[in-house]
């Protein structure tokens, strides 16, 4: 898979469905039981990924799911989730095996974020962004970066994330305004980043910068900025409509000193990072997160349709034909999205020449699906779902973030169309 068709220079499943009557076997292990209960398929996945999927499900069941409502209600960054994932050795899923990680790719990232997202989307978002940051560091890591960052990540001792978005460039994350100056001894970084996931909680931040005002679009540098660097100033917390556990904050960098060893790749060539690493891994992480959320809404709807009965007839909602039809449409939407995401991951990991439109479209499709399915879940579950602080209400709020997070759904559909028609994306 290559994003070379972006042409920057010229541009300047099989699934185990719970259904309406599925019952979980009492013979399954805790982690496996959670997979079955949540309709999570591990068929046709590599054995190593199946193992990680089951391990993730066990962490979700024991540590993440029980506190998911609290995360939303208190707008609390899910430290317990990240700690539990670290203790289970899952923070290093993107780290090469040589440094203690699991060397997963796009498919693995989407599968693991799906497993987390069906219980706590905020936790999946925070974990996913850590994984994207890790992938960026690992892509061309020097020996110094391997030892200082990748080993610590694999050992569960280090959380990283991206700091790319800016107010001035909006959804165009690949056109930073933050600047660096090389003093000869170190870099000085000046600028303000917006919507930094894990803001104030990560141990390091992958920051994009542009060297000068006359630099071309796409001509920028990426650096690793340690969280304890003098000159890092966090602005007021941002409380979202949904994904309330995400500490998405603005970060002002005031002449922050960064050692030369923290430069990723060569200065000024980081458009490669933006479109060969950041974009595909971010899109797959978010697609998996929103697929998990859509599956959770599907599960909750099935549970309600089975349980809700009319006293005068004894009939349950699942016995009503219109409910059966509408539920089947929800199920079909989720399965189509899962199939697209799995195919995108496989093609991307194989470096398939036609992977690009699959990867570009998977987050857009997951966004459309999760908004549609959570909205339909609200309708089918009625007053029970519409009450304050209901789980489906939270799902509906969380789902809306899918269309807003950069690259937006409309932008991804535009890029997909241009890719399919042989046009440069930008």
Pin down the residues of each PLM region:
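Extreme N-terminal basic, low-complexity initiation segments
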Residues: 1-13
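Glycine-rich flavin
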Residues: 76-87, 91-197
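Glycine-rich phosphate/pyrophosphate-binding beta-alpha loops
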Residues: 194-199, 279-285, 402-405
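Glycine-rich phosphate/cofactor-binding loops in nucleotide/flavin-utilizing enzymes
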Residues: 381-426
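Glycine-rich beta->alpha junctions and the first turn(s) of the following alpha-helix
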Residues: 239-334
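A short core secondary-structure module
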Residues: 192-234
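Amphipathic, small/basic residue-rich leader segments at the start of a protein or domain
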Residues: 3, 16-25, 29-127
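C-terminal helix-coil-helix/basic helical segment that borders enzyme active sites and/or dimer interfaces
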Residues: 65-72, 335-365, 378-386
């Amino acid at each position: 898979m290559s994003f070379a068709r972006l042409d920057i220079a010229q541009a300047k499943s099989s699934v185990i469905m719970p259904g309406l009557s599925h019952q979980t076997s009492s013979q399954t292990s805790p982690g496996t039981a959670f997979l079955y209960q949540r309709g999570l398929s591990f068929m046709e996945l590599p054995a190593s990924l199946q193992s990680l999927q089951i391990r993730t499900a066990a962490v979700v069941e024991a540590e993440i799911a029980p506190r998911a409502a609290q995360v939303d209600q208190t707008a609390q960054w899910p430290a317990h989730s990240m700690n539990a994932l670290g203790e289970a050795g899952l923070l290093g899923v993107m780290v090469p095996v040589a440094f203690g990680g699991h060397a997963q790719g796009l498919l693995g990232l989407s599968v693991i974020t799906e497993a987390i997202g069906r219980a706590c989307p905020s936790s999946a978002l925070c974990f996913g962004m850590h994984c994207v940051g890790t992938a960026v560091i690992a892509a061309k890591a020097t020996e110094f970066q391997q030892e200082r960052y990748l080993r610590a990540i694999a050992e569960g001792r280090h959380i990283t994330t991206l700091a790319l978005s800016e107010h001035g460039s909006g959804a165009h994350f690949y056109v930073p305004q933050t600047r660096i100056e090389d003093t000869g001894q170190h870099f000085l970084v000046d600028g303000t980043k917006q919507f930094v996931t894990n803001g104030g909680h990560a141990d390091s931040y992958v920051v994009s910068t542009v060297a000068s005002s006359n630099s071309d679009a796409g001509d920028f540098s990426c650096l690793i900025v340690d969280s304890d660097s003098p000159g890092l100033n966090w602005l007021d917390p941002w409380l979202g409509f949904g994904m309330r556990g995400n500490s998405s904050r603005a970060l002002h960098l005031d002449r922050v000193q960064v050692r030369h060893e923290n430069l990723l790749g060569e200065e000024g060539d980081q458009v490669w990072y933006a479109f060969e690493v950041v974009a595909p891994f971010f899109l797959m992480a978010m697609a998996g997160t929103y697929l998990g959320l859509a599956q959770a809404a599907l599960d909750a709807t099935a549970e309600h349709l089975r349980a809700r009965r009319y006293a005068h007839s004894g009939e349950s909602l699942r016995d009503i034909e219109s409910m059966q039809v509408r539920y089947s449409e929800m199920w079909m939407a989720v399965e189509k999205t899962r199939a697209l995401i799995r195919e995108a991951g496989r093609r991307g990991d194989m470096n398939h020449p036609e992977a690009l439109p699959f990867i570009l479209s998977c987050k857009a499709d997951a966004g459309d699906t999760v908004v549609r399915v959570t909205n339909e879940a609200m309708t089918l579950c009625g007053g029970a779902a519409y009450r304050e602080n209901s789980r489906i209400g939270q799902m509906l709020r969380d789902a809306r973030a899918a269309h807003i997070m950069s690259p937006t759904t409309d932008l991804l559909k535009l890029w997909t169309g241009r890719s399919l028609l042989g046009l440069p994306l930008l």
